Amino acid sequence: MFGLFDFIDEWIRALFTDSIVSNYTKMFAHVNDEVGNIAAQVGATPFDYNSEIYNMIRALSETVIIPIAGMILTFVLCYELIQMILEKNNMAEFDIANIYKWMMKTFIAVYVLTHTFDITMAVFDVAQSVVNASAGIISGSLDADVDLADLADYLDSLTVGELFGLWLESNILGLAMRAISLCIFLIIHGRMIEIYLTISVAPIPFSTIVNREWGSIGNSYLKSLFALGFQGFLIMVCVAIYAVLIRTSMGGDIQTSLWSAAGLSLLLLMTLFKSGSLCKAIFNSN
């Protein structure tokens, strides 16, 4: 009779132990996968991320937005020419050299407008090179390993009630980690959608960049491009810090490790949310 109880006890203990080990292993494997996916996504240019979306955005910009930008550029240049004439006492003191300056400015403005996507992609190419260079330095810090031998020894020392509580905790935290991962997924991919939306209207702010009064629109737009591009670098730094903290938090017991992993994942989510506003503040972008 007592042998039957012992058998049931061992069976329950083995069931909980295997489930806890599986949850624990999956959780940290999920952490490694999530970190690797983030590092891969933020290092992609708009073309590398999805060439089909990029080509669609470029086609829309060139066929729909550039004609509007051309009208804006014409208005801006005509307005500047009229202003140039009037401020010189209705051409009574007008210097013919100003016409050549205006023609040069017009040439530069038209060149910038017709090469909008080349300039825009150059910004993200620079940002990508920075992200890739940083990835080469911190990639070795992105793995969190699980010592299954120590974990099994620790679980063997627990009672059935303690194992049940730990099993319940591991399942709850596993669900929480998946919810946090979904939010992180939305942030990373939402950034790329924001980039596509931003570059789709690039010709309009670029059409104002050579004008003294309207140039602030183009300058602010360039700042926002650099902010979006270099946000990837800040995300890489956040991920590297997160991975190091995850690895160093695994020295205690399993409960501490589980809650630390969940708390640090929530912290990563918060820092990723802040990375966009921080980068805009650095580049003074509105």
Q: Predicted segment positions?
A:
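Elongated alpha-helical scaffolds
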Residues: W102-K105
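Membrane-water interface regions at transmembrane-helix termini and the short interhelical loops
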Residues: L81-F94, S181-F185, E213-W214
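Hydrophobic alpha-helical transmembrane segments
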Residues: I66-Y79, I195
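Alpha-helical transmembrane segments of multipass membrane proteins
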Residues: L81, R178, P203-S207, A240, ...
